């Protein structure tokens, strides 16, 4: 387990797949998140995926040092399918009182530093699927900051890049044989229903109007949008120095 040395409002700890969390600690993680996110069905999310803590390859937990409560989580898994390698951001939650703070940004930076160190570099492709426009907006902002990075779906493009569409279909097929993709919108019909249909009480809006409009127009309460950022060859030094420093 690795800790973030900058300890002010919270502590960050990273664990790899080799960890073995006691059942009581896993229950504490879920209970603390549910208490801190009372309008979200955290119990359903983890209850529908009982082996999820054993499945994550990478896990960051944010803890409030005062009460020793879990206040944030980012869990991910490495996937390899043929020549395609990608990092799937599986779970991302921050309790209500830390919304609009630096916590989520710090979790992401710390997480990517640890993944890069453990894996000998960042993956060429970072993936999530989400009902939340804020998550897509994070991918959009990340791709805009990294020279040569490619975003999918690109809401500013008249049509999606054909090779990114092919990649997106491979990714969805790798994640689940039961899911399908609408290639032009990035929509995965039923994606949220397959995970936790009652998790979100509502659709939160991001700071980007185009992103919000896309989600409102295409995403129902049972659906998700696939989000992908492909890094260009040679992007690693820039990401290390400018993004996850």
Language-model features: locations:
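Terminal substrate-recognition subdomain of acyl/acetyltransferases
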Residues: 1-21, 50, 54, 116-245
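Flexible, active-site-proximal loop/turn residues at the rims of small-molecule/cofactor binding pockets
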Residues: 80, 98, 132
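A conserved beta-strand-loop-helix scaffold within acyl/acetyltransferase catalytic domains
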Residues: 14-94, 115
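Short acidic, glycine/Ser/Thr-rich loop/turn "cap" segments at secondary-structure junctions
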Residues: 91-98, 123-127
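Short, solvent-exposed secondary-structure capping/transition elements
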Residues: 86, 100-103, 119-121
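A short linear-motif detector with a strong N-terminal bias
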Residues: 37-41, 67-71, 104-108, 203-209
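Conserved acetyl-CoA-binding loop-helix of GNAT-fold acetyltransferases
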Residues: 94, 99-115
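Loop/helix-junction capping segments adjacent to catalytic residues or to phosphate/diphosphate-binding pockets
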Residues: 83, 101, 136
